Regions:
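Extracytoplasmic
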Residues: 1-223
Length: 223
């Protein structure tokens, strides 16, 4: 049975065994072999944890109403991966649908030279090739804390994935199923939204629409 009940409120989940970002960075730098963790990881005021391949982060959150919720996650790339991260998610030990197996956490890229905007209209100046034609600038990976709603990696919908939470305490597990060097932080749970319009609302919005009377203009569908 499909659950369509919408949850209520915004809640911050608690991260099991989370560590202060500055402490994490200092611990990494004590290992002389580590030279990839960016200083930007310390620009964070919540607890965090590192997820290498198949590592899991466990969160608990209490909600006052059962229903559908969006999940909003902070993350940062602290390794050398050039590909988007993929994580798998479970709620109370279960996966509610297959899309929870492949949730995307994108790597962020920016132009190598970010100071090439000129004029009040913010027009960008692109590098030129030997023929004087504009070419795409080189890209750098941005290693900063990023906040995102959780989407499946196919992005079949512009809306985030919805997760059913029971009333009371829920355990949310996030597993890294891609490359190492991923760190995650605060997980926020927000009530989902029902954007489905009723027939009455839809009809009211299109009350002035012209009916198709010519069969040549009619759209035929198989039902």
């Amino acid at each position: 049975k499909k659950n369509t009940t919408i949850g209520e409120g915004t809640h911050v989940a608690s991260l099991k065994d989370g560590i202060d970002a500055n402490k994490f960075y200092n611990n990494k730098k004590k290992d002389s072999t580590d030279d990839t963790t960016p200083k930007a990881v310390t620009n964070y005021n919540s607890t965090m944890t590192e997820l290498n391949y198949n590592d899991k982060a466990e969160y608990t959150v209490k909600v006052d109403k059962e229903g559908l919720y969006y999940l909003n996650l902070d993350y940062i790339s602290i390794g050398e991966s050039l590909s988007d991260y993929t994580v798998k998610l479970a709620v109370n030990g279960k996966q509610q649908y297959s899309e929870m197996n492949t949730i995307a956490l994108p790597i962020i890229w920016a132009d190598e030279d970010t100071k090439t905007y000129v004029g009040s209209d913010k027009k960008k100046s692109f590098p030129l090739d030997s023929y004087g034609d504009e070419i795409a600038p080189s890209q750098n990976r941005v290693q900063e804390w990023t906040n995102t709603y959780l989407h499946n990696n196919t992005y079949v919908s512009s809306l985030p994935l919805s997760f059913y939470l029971k009333k009371g305490v829920n355990k949310i597990t996030i597993e890294n199923v891609s490359s190492g060097g991923l760190a995650v932080g605060k997980l926020q749970v927000e009530a989902g939204k029902d954007n489905t319009k009723s027939y009455k609302e839809y009809a009211s919005e299109h009350s002035n629409a012209e009916l198709v009377k010519d069969s040549a203009d009619a759209l035929q569908v198989d039902a």
